[in-house]
C-alpha cells in the first residue's frame, strides 16, 4: 500500500514538475521572442543610414506577424478605428446626408430622416461648396476629404455654404453634428400578397431593433411567409447573429457553439433568458418561429450570415437558396493597444448545431485565401453545382429530417442558383467599371427632379411605370459615348435587362432613398430572390415538411 502511494506521489511529482517545466519553457520562448524583436528594432534605430518612421515600421512588423496566423487576425490603425466601429455600432457622428462627388463637387443625394441637415432645410440636389468658410469645390475632392470635413464630435458646429439652383447667392447653414444611423436593414417590403422580404447587410448593434421593426411592419400587412436576404452580408457581431436566429427557432435549440485554445466550449441557445419577454417595435422575442422561411445566400455571405443560415438549415427550419457561402468559421475579439489602434485576434472556431465547421482552408496563405473567390468563379463553381467538390467526409445530416448537408468551406444551399454570366457583356463591364449608370442617373435626377416628383406622386406609381423608354435610353447612350463607351448592338441584347433595371433602380434611390433599390432590382434581376419567391409560394417547400 505504501509502495503504491509512493508510486502515485512520485508520478504526481513528475507530472507536476513536467507541467511546471512546460510552462517555464513557454514563458522563456515568449521572453526570447520579445527580446529579439526589440533587439532588431534597436539595431535599426542605432545603425540605419537614414531617418525612418518608427511607428510605421512597428505597424508593418505587427501586420506581417499577424498575417502568419490566419486571414482574419489583423491590425486596425488608430485613424481607421472610428470608421471600423461605425459599422459595428450602427451609427456615426456627422451631418446626415447621402452624397456623391460629381465634377469635384460634393452634391447631396438626399438627407437622412431626422438628421441635422434635414432639420435645417438642406435639400436633395444641393451642392456643398464651402465648409467653415473654406472652399471645397474643384480641389480633386475625395470621399476621405468629405468624411474629414463633415464628421466630428457630437454637438460640434460646422457651417456649410450651399449652392442651390434658382438661388442667386450661396446659402449658409449652421449644422450641429449628431449621431447618424447606419441601417443594417436597408429595405423590407411585401414581395407578394403573403410573402414579406427583409434585406440585412451586416450584423450591427442596431440590427435587432431594425429586424424586429421590419417583422412587426410586415406582420401588420398580412405576412405569412418570409424571405430573409443575407446575400453579400459579410457578417458582424456573434451576439446579433444569435439574436436573429433566435427569432426563427423555438426554445432550447442550439444556434451555434464556439471553442478555442484559451476559450472553453460555449453553447449559444435559442431563447436566452436575457432576451425572454423583451419587446422590439411591438414584437416579442421569438417573433417568427412559425411560418415558411427562405434564406438567400451567395459567395459573399460570411461569418454571422453563415451562423444564421447554418442554424436554420441544421434545424430544418428554413430552405437555404443561392450559392455556397464564403466559408468563415472563426471568431475574433478586439483588443485596444496603448496608442489607440486595435488588434482583432481569432480566439475560437464556431460550429453549426450539427457540428459542421464551415471555415474554408487557409494554409496556403492570405493571398491565396482571398483569391479563392476568383478561383471558384474560374472553376465554374458559381455556374454549375457539379463543379463544387463535396467529398463524403464533409457530409452530415440535419437534426430533424436527416437531410444531407455539408461542412468544410461555407454553407452549401439546399437549392443552388447559378450565376448568370451571359448578360455581363464586354460593353456592360466597361459601363460598370466607369460607374456610368450611377453618374448618368444622378445627373438625370439632378436636372429633372421637380418634373419626376410631379409625375410620380409615390414610389408605387414609379414601380409600375415604364421608365427606361427609347428617349431615356437614347440619352444614356449619348452619355456613354461621350465617356468613351461605344454602343454595341449584340452586347446590348445580352445586357439590356440589367442595364435598364439598374437605371430604374438608381433613379429611384436618387429620388427617394436606398430602400427603393431592392423592390426594383429583386423583381427584375435578382435570380436568387426570384427562385426563393417561387419556392416559398410553390409546392416544393411543402413537400420537404420543414419545421414551420
List PLM regions with ranges.
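Bacterial Sec-dependent N-terminal signal peptides
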Residues: 1-30
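Cleft-lining beta-strand/loop regions that shape enzyme active-site pockets
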Residues: 22-33, 37, 41-54, 77, ...
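Structured segments of extracytoplasmic/periplasmic soluble domains
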Residues: 39, 43-47, 51, 55, ...
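Extended, small/polar residue-biased N-terminal targeting/export presequences
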Residues: 45-109, 155-187, 256, 522-533, ...
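Functional cores that coordinate and move charged inorganic groups
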Residues: 305-308, 337-338, 351-371
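Conserved functional hotspot residues or short segments at active or partner-binding sites
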Residues: 357-358, 362-548
Amino acid at each position: 500500500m505504501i509502495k503504491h502511494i509512493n508510486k502515485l506521489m512520485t508520478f504526481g511529482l513528475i507530472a507536476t514538475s513536467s507541467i511546471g517545466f512546460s510552462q517555464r519553457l513557454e514563458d522563456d520562448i515568449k521572453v526570447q521572442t520579445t527580446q529579439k524583436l526589440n533587439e532588431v528594432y534597436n539595431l535599426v534605430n542605432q545603425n540605419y543610414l537614414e531617418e525612418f518612421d518608427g511607428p510605421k515600421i512597428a505597424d508593418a512588423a505587427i501586420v506581417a506577424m499577424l498575417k502568419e496566423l490566419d486571414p482574419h487576425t489583423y491590425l486596425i490603425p488608430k485613424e481607421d478605428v472610428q470608421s471600423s466601429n461605425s459599422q459595428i455600432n450602427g451609427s456615426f457622428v456627422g451631418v446626415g446626408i447621402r452624397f456623391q462627388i460629381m465634377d469635384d463637387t460634393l452634391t447631396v443625394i438626399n438627407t437622412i430622416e431626422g438628421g441635422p441637415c434635414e432639420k435645417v432645410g438642406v435639400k436633395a440636389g444641393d451642392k456643398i461648396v464651402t465648409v467653415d468658410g473654406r472652399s471645397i469645390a474643384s480641389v480633386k475632392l475625395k470621399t476621405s476629404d468629405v468624411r474629414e470635413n463633415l464628421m466630428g464630435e457630437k454637438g460640434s458646429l460646422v457651417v456649410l455654404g450651399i449652392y442651390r439652383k434658382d438661388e442667386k447667392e450661396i446659402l449658409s447653414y449652421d449644422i450641429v453634428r449628431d449621431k447618424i444611423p447606419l441601417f443594417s436593414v436597408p429595405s423590407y417590403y411585401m414581395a407578394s400578397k403573403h410573402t414579406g422580404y427583409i434585406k440585412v447587410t451586416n450584423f450591427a448593434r442596431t440590427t435587432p431593433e431594425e429586424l424586429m421593426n421590419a417583422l412587426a411592419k410586415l406582420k401588420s400587412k398580412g405576412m405569412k411567409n418570409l424571405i430573409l436576404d443575407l446575400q453579400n452580408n459579410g457578417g458582424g457581431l456573434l451576439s446579433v447573429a444569435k439574436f436573429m436566429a433566435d427569432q426563427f427557432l423555438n426554445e432550447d435549440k442550439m444556434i451555434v457553439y464556439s471553442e478555442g485554445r484559451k476559450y472553453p466550449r460555449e453553447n449559444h441557445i435559442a431563447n436566452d433568458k436575457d432576451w425572454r419577454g423583451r419587446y422590439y417595435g411591438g414584437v416579442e422575442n421569438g417573433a417568427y418561429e412559425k411560418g415558411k422561411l427562405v434564406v438567400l445566400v451567395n459567395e459573399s455571405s460570411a461569418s454571422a450570415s453563415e451562423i444564421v443560415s447554418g442554424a436554420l438549415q441544421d434545424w430544418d427550419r428554413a430552405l437555404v437558396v443561392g450559392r455556397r457561402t464564403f466559408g468563415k468559421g472563426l471568431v475574433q475579439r478586439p483588443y485596444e493597444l496603448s496608442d489607440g489602434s486595435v488588434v482583432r485576434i481569432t480566439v475560437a472556431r464556431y460550429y453549426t448545431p450539427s457540428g459542421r465547421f464551415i471555415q474554408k482552408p487557409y494554409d496556403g496563405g492570405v493571398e491565396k485565401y482571398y483569391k479563392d473567390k476568383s478561383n471558384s468563379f474560374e472553376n465554374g463553381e458559381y455556374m454549375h453545382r457539379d463543379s463544387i467538390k463535396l467529398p463524403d467526409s464533409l457530409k452530415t445530416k440535419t437534426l430533424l429530417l436527416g437531410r444531407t448537408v455539408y461542412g468544410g468551406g461555407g454553407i452549401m444551399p439546399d437549392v443552388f442558383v447559378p450565376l448568370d454570366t451571359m448578360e455581363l457583356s464586354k460593353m456592360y463591364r466597361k459601363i460598370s467599371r466607369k460607374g456610368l449608370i450611377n453618374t448618368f442617373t444622378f445627373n438625370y435626377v439632378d436636372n429633372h427632379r421637380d418634373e419626376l416628383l410631379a409625375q410620380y406622386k409615390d414610389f408605387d406609381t414609379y414601380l409600375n411605370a415604364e421608365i427606361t423608354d427609347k428617349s431615356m435610353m437614347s440619352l444614356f447612350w449619348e452619355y456613354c459615348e461621350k465617356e468613351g463607351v461605344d454602343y454595341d448592338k449584340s452586347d446590348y441584347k445580352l445586357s439590356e435587362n440589367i442595364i435598364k433595371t439598374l437605371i430604374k433602380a438608381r433613379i429611384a434611390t436618387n429620388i427617394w432613398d436606398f430602400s427603393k433599390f431592392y423592390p426594383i432590382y429583386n423583381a427584375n434581376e435578382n435570380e436568387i430572390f426570384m427562385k426563393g419567391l417561387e419556392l416559398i409560394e410553390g409546392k416544393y417547400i411543402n413537400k420537404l415538411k420543414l419545421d414551420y
